[in-house]
Amino acid sequence: LAIAMSDSVIQCQEAFGAFEGKKKEPDLRVMMGLWPNVVQIVTTEDTGIKTFADIKGKRVGVGAPNSGVELNARMIFEANGMSYDDAKVDYLSYGEAIDQIKNGQCDVAFVTSGLGNATIKELGTMKKIRFIPIDGKAIENLTKKYPFYMPYSIPKTSYDTEVDTPTAAVMNVMLVDKKLPDDVVYDILTGIYSEKGLATIGASHATAKREIKLDTG
């Protein structure tokens, strides 16, 4: 069993992106979807950055090399018609990038996580934060080329910002090998989706209580 973001899983299955040049892994199977990892591109009001285009020439923490955050950052630059060459990119984890924002050494941090991220909240106690939107042509480009992304929104109540911010998200999934016996899969899912299992998961994080609507169309 493993937990991974769906974008990383597809890249691994089909050997592209971070897995370019490696063998394909067609035996990977998603057993269940878990929670949305929300792309949160955070900056502070004193930078003057309001749109993705404003990132040009700025200091941007994009995540550790080939991490889930960094893979998201690379694709989102692409969706906006830009590349890392357009900014002063630093391969920092989002915690490190946010620390540098506090110290005035970084302008923007890519964070891919559930909403209510503690490091972003801490930054918000020190500076007025703002999220850079992913909308319009950018979200259209992103979801068309990489359909594992979905449009999402960061509610203003999540971090006490002035407005809701349109963005993108990818699902975290529970991953197994296709050789895992069906009865084992059944037992795992039965345990998770039992009344006790759902109560335990729901108590772990606010996003775990949100239902995902299934569309038969």
Regions from the language model: what does each represent?
Residues 1-22, 95-100, 115-124:
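Pocket-flanking alpha-helical
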Residues 6-9, 36, 44-47, 65, ...:
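Solvent-exposed coil/turn segments that connect beta secondary-structure elements
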Residues 130-187:
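C-terminal lobe and pocket-closing loops
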